[in-house]
Each structure stands twice: as C-alpha cells, then as structure tokens.
Amino acid sequence: GACPGAAGEVRLIYFPEKRFKAKKEMTKWKKTTADEDFTAQWHLEGLSPGTRYVTVLEARKPGSQQTTAILRGGFETAPAKNARTSLTFCMTTCHDFIRTDNGLRGHKIYPAMEEINPSFLVHAGDIEYYDKPEPWALTVELMRFKWGRIFALPDNRSFYKSHTTYFLKDDHDTLKNDCWPGQQYGTVTFEEGMHLFNDKQFPSRTPRYQTVLWGKDLQVWFLEGRDYRSPNTMIDGPDKTILGVEQKSWLFK
C-alpha cells in the first residue's frame, strides 16, 4: 500500500538539460500539510519551447536546514508552433492497483513506453478505480490513498517522474461507473470527486478542454467527457449531451 504522508518542506530546481551555462531556477521551500495530502505542486512559467528540462526535488523536515531526500526527473516542453520536428507520443487508459500485471513493480506498459521514450504521454482516464475493492474508495481519504498507492509503484513512478504527461479523467477516477453530476458514491459527491481530480491531483488549464500544439504538424485535442454530461437516465433528445453546451460550441468553432 501507500506510505503515510508526513509534514515537511520541499522545493523544486529545474534547468535545461543541454544548456550547461543556463541558470538553474529554484522555487521557494513549500510546506506539505495534511490538507493537501502532504503533497506539493508548482506552476512553472517562462519555459523554453522544444526543450528537455532536468528536475531536482529536494525535501527536508519542517524547520530544518538539512536536505534529507532528493528525487531527480525531467520533462519535455512542446516545440514552438512553427517548428517542424519529429516526435513520438504514447497513449494509455484504464488501469488500477489490484490489476497490475507485473506484481508490485506496477504495469508492464511503463517499461515498454520507457524504451520508446516518447515526447509526451496522454493518459485518457480511469487511472484508478474508486469503485473496485481493496479498498472501495467511499471517502475522499480512501480516494487519496488509492492515488498515492498507484503512483508509488516503482515502474509507474519511474516513468512519470521523467516524462511530460497529460491526464484526462473518466468515470471510475471521478466517482464511480457511468457517473454524472449530482450523484454520490459513499460519502463523496460527484462535485467533490471532480474537485479532487481537477484541482488537487491533476490541475491544468481552465477550462480543461483545450487544444495543444506540438510544433507545426501536430495539434492534440483534449475533451472533458464527465463534468458537463447529462444523466444517462435522461430521455434521448437534442438536449441530452456528453460535452455540455459551452464545450460543444467551442468544439464546433
């Protein structure tokens, strides 16, 4: 299972991999607290396009001046919108902890993708299943437990710490099977599940439906298929929707 979180302080150092004289950027130390599940996130700006960055995460005890843990990784930024360049990307979906195919190492797809070394990955949802056993995630705390556990698997962790990834959600990692706004699973409302994914686990752009350019030749479209959908029980008709009025209008434009 996942290790319990602990209060501490963390900071992120990042710099271009192949620019040896480039300045190393460094964030301020940030405290980890129980309210944020003992995690920290940063919104980075001013990154150069088409660049491989090295990341160094440092951690220490609260109030200490001594670094007690270091985690190295990296990510790649999209090329400039007019740049022509060769690239490879991967896409996956639907896995969870109780159905790993490589024991406690994780999922075999991750070492396979490491060999490809893609510019980026799209995980299209159902990253975890709240409504599967061991345990049934009927509270926000158990949902967070499942997130911590699956990303602690060595093969999964090794991949994600070094690769740019776009995370989309589906039903099982929002709330439960075939869910829609207004429903509840255990003690968790749909809106709470949506908030946990959108704002805590994988904060990104607002709105979450976006297009992203990777150079001149590739445009990736990301749709949001859960937040705005009509109930499955609604009678079929022109007003029944998966995307919602605003997202559908944006897509048509």
Model-derived segments and spans:
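Metal-dependent phosphoester/phosphodiester hydrolase catalytic core
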Residues: 1-253
